[in-house]
Amino acid sequence: MQIIKIMLAAAGLTALSLSCFAQEEEAPTRYTYATYYSCGGGPLARADEIMADDSDRMNGFVADGTLAAWGWMAHHTGGQWQRISWYQADGMDALLDAGDAIQGTGDDDADDAAAEEEDDGPGFGMICPRHDDYIWQVQNGANSDARGEVGMSVYHVCDVSREERADEIVDEHFAPVLNKMVKDGKLSSWGWQSHVVGGHFRRLQTMTAADAKSLMAARAEALEVVYGEDNAAGEEFTAICGDHVDYIWNAQLESN
């Protein structure tokens, strides 16, 4: 069974540390397809088991270049979503092709393993019957060799007419602070992504660290710098993207 196949098919493929990479200007634009699950119809451990059973196939898509990365994350704190499945590809066409490959509806050489365990699908659908799909465009970020076991996602509601200015503030004022924290080992990664398709959240800020305590300490330090007293850039950013919802996630599965 390929659970991502089933849930993407149900969603109609509306075109997810978390894992975001700094991009050079000439490099292809990286996109994230993220599915956020609301669960409660059964044991979440079973949903995690189903995803783990499919991890070899998903890892194969990374190995052959179909995907740049993918992952599965479990809720720790915040909000209503309880699980995330996500994958990334370089370029929108590549992202859409990856969706076809995951569903097993691509060209004649598409991976037949997508249908092998189809009977597991309804079990997952009963456990996590509702979901929200987003496509994000990676705008900025940095990562290290160390895997971030715990991540924070901040989903921003922004003034659409001024959200590009928020991107500029991130590039000019926030990125240097967060890049240094990655370099110093306080964070494993951070990222900034913009809305392409999906719900009402317009920007996604992520950071990951070795554990929850390290993550919260790094977050507090970063907030003090970028939103500290008399910080005009922080005040302007808040005026554009003030409303937000915070989540902390445990990284369950990941490959990049």
Model regions: which residues?
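Short S/T/G/P-rich N-terminal loop/turn motif that feeds into the first structured element of a domain
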Residues: 22-256
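Positively charged n-region of N-terminal signal peptides that target proteins for export
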Residues: 1-6
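Bacterial N-terminal signal peptides
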Residues: 7-17
